[in-house]
A protein has these predicted regions:
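Conserved catalytic or regulatory cores that recognize and/or transform ribose-phosphate-containing ligands
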Residues: 1-215
Length: 215
């Protein structure tokens, strides 16, 4: 238990390592979060602690494990780190999200509206779920680089769990910096409130909860 003379620990936020296409969102997020007093780990800004005896994957996943809060951003780029010889390999960004969910990290999530629109359209065309989408051949584009972005969104909202069991499934839609910035501002300017929440609910480690099924 912290005494009156102890200096409060600075809260650390890990921002998911997606970069391409949302640079302005990341810049705005970094400026806002640092202005509120958080230590921000963001690969885009070079502020994520890295060590030369670890791979890029390991450095990013270790950041997720050690941070206090995870800010996940699902953009239109699936991310790097995919093994071209293994069609089932996942990007760093996807693995970060899964790690945050597995650890039940206190998290806030943003998803580009292109991802949500594409999911809705494909569902109406009879391509609901990861297995159905995996049969499709999507041409890479700036609109939506990879259909596994939809998989990420569905994992974030716990799509496979019964509605009554879904907790921590709020995902905010955004299109650009003008949409993302107000959400980040309204959520994270409550520094003391968030610190108290973490102290109350996570001081003995994250609670156990039902996990989203992986495809």
């Amino acid at each position: 238990m912290r005494t009156a003379t102890d200096k409060p620990k600075q809260l650390t936020i890990m921002v998911s390592s997606t970069v391409y296409g949302i640079e302005e969102v990341l810049e705005a997020a970094y400026d806002l979060l640092t202005s509120y007093g958080y230590e921000v780990w963001m690969s885009h800004k070079g502020s994520l602690p890295v060590f030369s005896n670890r791979s890029a994957f390991e450095n990013c996943l270790e950041g997720v494990r050690k941070c206090d809060i995870f800010l996940g951003i699902i953009g239109t780029s699936y991310g790097t780190g995919i093994d071209k010889d293994d069609p089932k390999s996942l990007s760093i960004v996807h693995l970060e999200l899964r790690e945050a969910i597995t650890l039940d990290k206190p998290r806030w999530l943003l998803t580009h509206d292109n991802v949500i629109t594409a999911r809705t359209l494909l569902m109406k065309l009879g391509h609901a779920g990861p297995k159905a989408r995996a049969k499709l051949n999507l041409k890479r584009s700036d609109v939506l680089e990879d259909l596994r972005l939809i998989d990420m969104y569905e994992e974030a909202i716990f799509d496979r769990l019964p509605l009554a069991e879904r907790k921590g499934n709020w995902v905010q839609k955004f299109h650009d910096r003008k949409d993302a910035s107000p959400y980040i501002m309204n959520q994270f300017r409550r520094y003391q409130e968030i610190a108290a929440y973490l102290e109350e609910h996570f001081k003995s480690g994250p609670p156990l909860k039902p996990q989203a099924q992986q495809p």
